[in-house]
Structures are given as C-alpha cells and as structure tokens.
Amino acid sequence: TTKLYIPPVRPEVVPRPRLIEQFTAGLGHKLTLVSAPAGYGKTTLVSAWLHAADVPFAWLSLDEGDNDPARFFAYLIAALQGIDVEIGRSVQGWLEAPHPPAIESLVTTLINDIARVSTSFVLVLDDHHAITERAIHESIGLLLDRQPSQMHLIIATRHDPPLPLARLRVRGELLELRQSDLRFTAEEATAFLNRSLGLDLSASEVAVLGERTEGWIAGLQLAGLSLQGRDAAGMARFIDEFSGRHQFVLDYLTDEVLKRQAEPVQEFLLRTSILDRLCGSLCDAVVGQDAGPDGAPHQDGQAMLEELQRANLFVVPLDDEREWYRYHHLFAQLLCARLEETRPDLTADLHRRAVAWHEENGLGFG
C-alpha cells in the first residue's frame, strides 16, 4: 500500500540545512512534532531528512479511514515490520479475533516487541491531523510514555495532537518545528521562485512576495505558478496586486482550511476578520453572544483564540502572554473577501462593535 511508502524528494526541492540539522539533533528526544498549517512543506521536509539521514525508518501516511483502531494498528504493524518482521506478530492475531483484548494490552505487547529490536529507527506518522479517535490518541500517548530507546517518533500534523506534549516539553523529550520555523527565509524564497520555478525575479520582487505570504510555501508556489509565462510588466503588476483575494489563494485556503472547520469556527473567523489585532474580549464584543447559524451560542473569544492557535489556523500570537493575536495576512484577506461575499449586511455592524470596544477601552481603532 502507498500508505507505507515515503514520498520521493523532487529534484527542485529547496535544501533546508538549518532544519535538517534540527531533525538530526532531535533523535535524542522521544518525539519530533512538526506542526503547522496546510502548505508549509511538512511532509516534504520529513521526507528530505530521511532521504539524507543514514537511519532506518518506518513511514505511515494517515487518513480519516484510520480512525478505526483495528485498521490503524494493522497499518502501524505493517509499517514497523519493515524494520523487523517479528514486531506485532502476536498482535496481528489478536486484531483478527472476534473479541480482541484491551488496546492497552495490544500497545504493551507492541512496545515489548520494539524493545527487542537491535537497531535504532524512526517511526513517522504523517498527516496525523486525520486522527480523531480518542482510543488511538491514548494508544500513541501510552507508546510515548513507555517508548523504547531504540525508537524515535516523528509526527507531522496540521494541528497539535491531544498528547502529553507539556510533560514531554518539561522533560526535554520533545523537539518542535512550527510555522515560524518552517516558513521560507528570504534566501529560501529566492531559491524556490528563481531556481525551482524557473523565474527571474529581483531581490525586491522576492521580498514583496515573501512579505505578503509571510514565508508560507504554498502561497509562494501559487504566486510563482501565476507568474510563469508573464512578461516583465505583467510580473510587476501581478506582484503589486498579489493578495489573499487572488483566485488560486482563495481556492486553496477555502478548500484546505476554511471548509474543514466546524460552522461555529467559520462564523468566528469571518466575523473577526475585520480586526487587525484580536484579543478575547474584543472578539466577544465583535462576534456578539447571539447564536451562530447552527443555533449554538458563540464560544468564549479567548478560548476560541487559544483553540485556533492549537489548530494552527493561520493565527499569529503578538505577545508572550498570548493575549493579542492576528491572522496571517493572506488568510485575513480571504476571510474578508468571504465576509463581503456571503454576509455583506454584517460588515458595518461588526465595525461599529469594534469601534465601541476600542473607545470603551481607551484605544484607537482603524
């Protein structure tokens, strides 16, 4: 099955030695967590490191169908048997039994099998955000708690999994690579646009696109594809006008991000898109306590902002206290465009609420 095969590294992929070094250093930890929104090159980066590193590995690409624990463990064991064919043999028999034992027993047996492996190896769980089944999250948490020293786990995901990350962080057992780490630097953006995509942009043109996209790789790729085949004047005009309202960007963010959110989250995102900076009480004032489209009351603003950050929904914290946030520029532009398109009657009232909150709190707005 293709779920067990590592994606190939294309020749045009931009080398990222600063991140490759971090992966190698991370082998001393239990877990490397690569957590960032869609389009930040998570899978490509993990694949590039494994192709460059001299380390045995097992790869499992997850999807929504893997929320069935029996299916998940079947694929997990198949991946691990690429390291050692004896891993999980007895567990396979249990999975096929009419009344399989408790999942904790399965995981414990699997851990004991891994502990008998003579070589160190890496297990990669890619697209981990597809997993919502609590029993599977608990199984991975148990595996991490008792993880044999031979194994290092890499999880690539669009949002943080419900695992004991705080405990691992305090113990120095966790390496984290996040949106701020994965975004392209100016040098990487130049290499990507001019070498990988075959453009011939000036440093200032690359800088404009880098600033507009905030180093978001998918955004740079969408811009680069749109630039191909244009003359110099057309390129200059496109770069000057490029925003989250560009059709390619609209389509990508709508399909890959916005449509995947629950209705109350979408409503919160749209209503707060008029704000340059967000905090909990400001969001409460703007969103209001009236019920959303599904009849459910809106969630507390601070709790929602914290949830958006955990879910890597293009939210950028502006202070260490996590009081103020902003949306990624292109994402904010998409949300504003969607608000104008779907709820034009709301915009003026949302602005009035925002102005009132700022006046009450002695702050300027706009």
Can you annotate each of these PLM segments?
Residues 122-123, 267:
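Hydrophobic "anchor" residues on beta-strands that sit immediately upstream
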Residues 2, 18-19, 44-48, 71-74, ...:
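Alpha-helical sensor/transducer elements of the RecA-like P-loop NTPase core
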Residues 33, 37-40, 46-50, 116, ...:
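C-terminal boundary/linker of central alpha/beta nucleotide-binding cores
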Residues 337, 345-366:
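Extended alpha-helical scaffolding segments used for macromolecular assembly and cargo binding
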Residues 28-32:
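Pre-Walker A (Motif I) flank of P-loop NTPase domains
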Residues 1-23, 89-95, 186, 191:
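Conserved adenine-nucleotide phosphate-binding loops and their immediately adjacent elements
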Residues 40, 44-121, 128-132, 176:
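Conserved phosphate-binding/catalytic loops and adjacent sensor/switch elements of nucleotide-binding enzymes
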Residues 64-67, 130, 159-162, 182-183, ...:
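Conserved nucleotide-binding/hydrolysis micro-motifs of P-loop NTPases
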